[in-house]
């Protein structure tokens, strides 16, 4: 596994840990919260300029960056611009990416940023092809994340 892919997978892991901190019923300690936030922010910024010509690796990079920038509370004023840049990168590869768990996860995080209905439809189309009797824990978690984003579209508002 190459360096940028392993860094992307590590960022996905740490961002997931931060996003779900305390969800297991364990207390949240401020030092752990601050450490994880800083770690995710530093990893996100260091990985931001990494790009790959391999579609799946680029998808993992985009997913990691969206997860990272969403999870952390830190922002030096350019986080929204960086997220938009990552969304642009993701859009460039989504059509080429084969139907897979990775694609559903990337569609889910892109949808969570812009709430574009076509992203949601694409994710559900892939999920509908999965064997519901043999779902992996990752597939079930991704389905739950998508459902959560669909039902809680904060801070999304329809402007009149």
What are these regions (language model features)?
Residues 129-160:
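Acidic, proline/glycine-rich low-complexity IDRs
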């Amino acid at each position: 596994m190459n360096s940028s892919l392993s860094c992307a997978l590590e960022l996905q892991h740490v961002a997931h840990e931060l996003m779900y901190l305390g969800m297991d019923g364990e207390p949240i300690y401020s030092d752990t919260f601050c450490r994880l936030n800083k770690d995710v922010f530093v990893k996100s910024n260091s990985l931001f300029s990494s790009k790959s010509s391999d579609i799946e690796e680029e998808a993992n990079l985009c997913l990691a960056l969206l997860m990272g920038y969403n999870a952390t509370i830190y922002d030096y004023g350019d986080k929204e611009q960086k997220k938009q840049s990552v969304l642009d990168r993701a859009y460039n590869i989504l059509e080429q990416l084969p139907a897979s768990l990775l694609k559903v996860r990337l569609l889910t995080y892109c949808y969570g940023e812009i709430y574009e209905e076509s992203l949601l439809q694409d994710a559900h189309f892939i999920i509908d092809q999965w064997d519901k009797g043999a779902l992996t824990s990752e597939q079930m978690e991704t389905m739950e994340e998508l459902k959560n984003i669909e039902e809680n579209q904060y801070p999304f508002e329809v402007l009149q």
